[in-house]
Regions:
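Bacterial Sec-type N-terminal signal peptides, specifically the leucine/valine-rich hydrophobic h-region
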Residues: 20-23
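N-terminal targeting leaders
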Residues: 2-7, 11-15, 25-203
Length: 203
């Protein structure tokens, strides 16, 4: 993947974050630090390099969109603060919500979405955040490292950064891909913890 494509993806990421930047303190009142979710540098060539077939990708995209639409219509929940991923109908909810009640709402709306098999969560509350101002730096640093690694580059690995914690989701073909991703994350300044939902695709 060339530098121009990487630059375009970064500009997309910054455009996505613009509302959060302009809302400033108001948004941070609820989230402490807005998680970087929904930013995936592999979207541009996802279909050609994703380990899933086109049919499975399309089905997962529908599930993801349905859940995001429900989040949009639910008071206290925001797609800016919660990332939704779906792989073979297994749904991953990652981000920050105001409290346990809203976490329950989030899980319930995913449960009641057709096409969902299982639900996995990495949900934190504002009080869990502490001092964390490095989400963007962590994300860009990690993405840059993953791009350069021939073992990981071009896979469907997704990265979310929540309160300076790195969360991986996606489908991989080799355990070494997960090991490399985790190693990079653990060696980035400011990362508090690393959690992996990565699953190996079995033949």
């Amino acid at each position: 993947m060339d530098f121009r494509l990487f630059l375009r993806q970064i500009l997309r990421a910054l455009a996505f974050l613009a509302p959060a930047i302009f809302l400033g303190g108001c948004l941070e009142y609820f989230t402490t630090v807005t998680p970087l979710t929904g930013i995936n540098v592999y979207d541009a060539n996802q279909v050609s390099q994703d380990e899933r077939g086109i049919y499975s990708i399309a089905k997962d995209k529908i599930v993801k969109t349905k859940i995001q639409t429900k989040i949009l219509g639910t008071s206290g929940l925001s797609n800016l603060n919660v990332d939704v991923e779906s792989f073979y109908g297994d749904v991953y909810l990652i981000g920050v919500v105001p409290d346990a009640e809203h976490k329950e709402k989030l899980v319930e709306l995913a449960k009641n979405t057709s096409g969902v098999n299982k639900i996995y969560t990495y949900i934190r509350f504002p009080k869990d955040g502490g001092e964390c101002e490095g989400n963007l730096a962590i994300m860009l640093n990690l993405k840059n490292n993953l791009f350069k690694d021939s073992i990981i580059s071009g896979t469907s690995v997704r990265v979310s950064v929540v309160q300076c914690n790195v969360v991986f989701t996606g489908i991989i073909t080799d355990i070494e891909q997960e090991k490399h991703a985790i190693w990079y994350a653990k060696h980035i300044t400011g990362v508090r913890d690393v959690y992996s939902f990565l699953k190996i695709l079995k033949d």
